[in-house]
């Protein structure tokens, strides 16, 4: 399955949600699965982004649906990047 990097920045509402219910992060990951994608790994980060997630989805349409659904909630802003395995990238050159 294609791999995507999902970079997340919490809004003030999202910060309050995570502070009051840290387990909400795992709940959202399960919701991502219900939308057809899988969170394979996830980190909390310092700096511009609050979270970096490695997500697998069957196609860009599914990933777009995930990004739109999560973004529409107003608790975080998302930047999603398709990731090409380095061997595939080298072979394409």
Where are these regions (language model features)?
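Short S/T/G/P-rich N-terminal loop/turn motif that feeds into the first structured element of a domain
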Residues: 1-34, 38, 45-49, 84, ...
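Short, well-ordered beta-strand segments in beta-rich or mixed alpha/beta enzyme
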Residues: 5-9, 43-66
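Generic structural signal for residues in well-ordered beta-strands
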Residues: 39-42, 78-80
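An amphipathic, aromatic/His-enriched active-site/gating alpha helix that lines ligand/cofactor pockets
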Residues: 57-84
């Amino acid at each position: 399955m294609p791999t995507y990097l999902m970079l997340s920045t919490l809004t003030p509402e999202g910060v309050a949600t995570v502070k009051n219910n840290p387990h909400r992060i795992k709940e959202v990951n399960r919701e991502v699965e219900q939308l057809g994608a899988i969170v394979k790994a996830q980190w909390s980060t310092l700096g511009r982004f609050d979270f970096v997630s490695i997500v697998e989805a069957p196609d860009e349409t599914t990933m777009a649906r995930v990004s739109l659904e999560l973004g529409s909630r107003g608790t975080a802003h998302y930047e999603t990047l398709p990731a090409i395995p380095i061997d595939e990238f080298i072979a394409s050159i």
